[in-house]
Amino acid sequence: MSPSPTALFCLGLCLGRVPAQSGPLPKPSLQALPSSLVPLEKPVTLRCQGPPGVDLYRLEKLSSSRYQDQAVLFIPAMKRSLAGRYRCSYQNGSLWSLPSDQLELVATGVFAKPSLSAQPGPAVSSGGDVTLQCQTRYGFDQFALYKEGDPAPYKNPERWYRASFPIITVTAAHSGTYRCYSFSSRDPYLWSAPSDPLELVVTGTSVTPSRLPTEPPSPVAEFSEATAELTVSFTNEVFTTETSRSITASPKESDSPAGPARQYYTKGNLVRICLGAVILIILAGFLAEDWHSRRKRLRHRGRAVQRPLPPLPPLPLTRKSNGGQDGGRQDVHSRGLCS
C-alpha cells in the first residue's frame, strides 16, 4: 500500500525540523584561570568553553599522550611536567569540532629571578624615550617583559645574560608596573621567577574630562591602549639582523568624522551626487529618444492615411450669346431638346 499524501507531508515537516550540519563544528575557546603564568606549586584551572548542548569535551596536552574527556582541568599544584601547550575540542553526535587555539601554560619560579632596570630612569616625561633592561646571572637566550594588566608578555630572544626593551615616544598608557622573566629556548615553558617590580612613571601628562572613558573598555582595548607605541627590538650574537615590533593604540573616535575623515566623507558625497546626476541625464536622454521615435511613427502614420483625392470630371463647355446670361441659358436648353 502506497503512503498517503498526509503521511508524506508530516514526514517532510519532521525532516525539515532536523538541523543539518554543514562543514565542521566551530572551535571552542581554552583559557587558564587565573593566568597562564603559574608559579610552581600554585593552583591553576584550564577551562574549555563550547556551544551549549555539547555531548563530549576533550582536553589534551600536545607532544604527549595525556588527555581527558572533560571540559575543566584543575591542577592543584603546578609542576614542571605540566607546563607546555594545551588545546581542546568537543563532539556532537559523530562530528568533532575544530581544535581550539593553543594555550601555552608556563611554569614560573623554576630559576632565580633576573633584575629589571630603566635607563635613564623610571621617571620619564611624556614624549621621551626609555629602555627597560632585563639582566640575569645565567646564560639564558630568551627574555620576556610583562606589564600588569596585559594579557600576555612580550617574548623575544636577546643577547646572553641581558635584554633591552626600548619604549619609543612614551605616553601615559606606558605608566605601570613591569616585571621580566628569563628562560632557555630549549625549555620554552620553564621560566625563572619574576623580577622585582619596576614602577614606570610618566610625567607631564594630564587627562581631561572629555577624554575619560564613559564605559569600561574591553580586554582587547586595554591591551592595545596599554601597549601603545611599544617597540621591542632584539639582536642575536649569531644573526646581525635587527627586528622591531610596534603596537600603536588609536584614540577613541568621536561620532562625527573630523580632519581627513571628514574630507573623505565630503568627497564620497560629491561622488554620489555626480553619479546621480549622470544617471538622471542618461534617463532623460532615453525618455527624449523614446518620445522622438513615437512622434516620428505617428507622423508616418498620418502621411499614410492622407491619400490624394480622385480628379473631378471635366465641366461641359458653354457659349455666351450677345443677349447676356439669360440668352446663354436658352441656347443650352434648346440644344438639349434638339439632341
UniProtKB/Swiss-Prot annotation:
PTM note: N-linked glycosylation at Asn-92 is not required for the cell surface expression, but contributes to maximal adhesion to type I collagen, collagen-related peptide (CRP), and, to a lesser extent, to the snake venom C-type lectin convulxin (CVX).
GO terms of biological process kind: collagen-activated signaling pathway; collagen-activated tyrosine kinase receptor signaling pathway; enzyme-linked receptor protein signaling pathway; immune response-regulating signaling pathway; platelet activation; platelet aggregation; positive regulation of platelet aggregation
Extracellular face residues: 21-267
Resulting phenotype, K61A: Increases collagen binding
N-terminal signal peptide: 1-20
Any one GO MF annotation of this record: collagen binding
Family annotation (SUPFAM superfamilies): Immunoglobulin (SSF48726)
Segments of this protein annotated with the region Disordered: 299-339
InterPro entries assigned to the protein according to its UniProt record, in alphabetical order: Ig-like_dom_sf, Ig-like_fold, Ig-like_Receptors_ImmuneReg, Ig_sub, Ig_sub2
PANTHER family on file: MHC CLASS I NK CELL RECEPTOR, PLATELET GLYCOPROTEIN VI
Role, per record: Collagen receptor involved in collagen-induced platelet adhesion and activation. Plays a key role in platelet procoagulant activity and subsequent thrombin and fibrin formation. This procoagulant function may contribute to arterial and venous thrombus formation. The signaling pathway involves the FcR gamma-chain, the Src kinases (likely FYN or LYN) and SYK, the adapter protein LAT and leads to the activation of PLCG2.
Illness association: Bleeding disorder, platelet-type, 11: A mild to moderate bleeding disorder caused by defective platelet activation and aggregation in response to collagen.
Name this protein carries in UniProt: Platelet glycoprotein VI
Origin species: Homo sapiens
